[in-house]
Amino acid sequence: MAEEVAETISATINATLNETAGNETARIPATPEGMALAYGSLVVMAIIPIFFGAFRSVRFQKEQRENGDTPEIMSDKDAAMFPIIASATLFGIYIVFQIFSKEYINLLLTVYFFFLGVLALAHILSPVVRKLIPDSMPNDPYHLLFVRGKDDKQEELMNYEFDNKDLVCLGVGAVFGVWYLLKKHWIANNIFGLAFALNGVEFLQLNTIMTGIILLGGLFVYDIFWVFATNVMVTVAKSFEAPIKLVFPQDILEKGLEANNFAMLGLGDIVIPGIFIALLLRFDVR
């Protein structure tokens, strides 16, 4: 009996070592050229949503004022609480990954980010699609309204107006969504990631420069603690299979689009500086 147990343990160890060695062999070490291309591409991809998102934030705020809507702006208190809420969320996700199976969690996240990514991408594509589709094509309006209760006790749950061009945008976004859902390809991940980052820079608005300083200062401490003082951030980033980061393979010159040795940049490192830059642009426009 003891010999059988020893043989089983030995076989398991050998299989694990062989699998690890196979993975290390399959992963080609990054060359200086590959690293330069990967990190340079990440820099370019980080600049794109900040640049376009900042200009879109100017237009978004202008539209809100013209429509008489009250803009949702981050206050000093919100900025001070942001790192605390982010820390609680990050640690909560870390605990969830320690308790439950990573496969089931990522399955739920994949479905959630599929719908979220399709909507984000459709919003980004809307101005382009509206210019490409000729005005001669029919563009019927639709109004989606959900209310709860009746008569004077009605509570509006959803009030969304859209048209045929919006449906085209949703269709295009759904194509990329299915690609991400089925393949989890890094290009599909980046497309969704760029859409999330651009929407974040557009819609998250600071009210003053001091608010931005409070936010950036708090998140500076947040990053130092969770990245360098603990392994929580790294563990969550490696376990969290969702388009919350931009990636680019360092071995793309050797393996092409099937490369798997990725350099990565979190969307938070793009959106947070981006909303501060968008604030400065709105100040200049005024």
PLM feature segments, named:
Residues 1-286:
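A membrane-topology feature that recognizes alpha-helical transmembrane segments
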